[in-house]
Amino acid sequence: MDIAIKQLDQLLQDDSVEKDKDMLYYLRGNAYRKKGDWKQALDNYQYAIDLNPDSPAVQARTMAIDILN
């Protein structure tokens, strides 16, 4: 997961992928979730939602919160 997170970090710094940043945050959130870092997962899902309210991160964030509660 660390390699995936590093690659996503690099892509997020690339301005040429501006239109896909919400998906990159969603994917990075998934990577953090699989790693067990729930705070980073939730933060990344929220970043994705802020960029695109229709992002699949909405459902992922809701499910993560349900699991944690």
Label the model's feature ranges.
Residues 14-17, 50-51:
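Structural marker of alpha-solenoid helical repeat scaffolds
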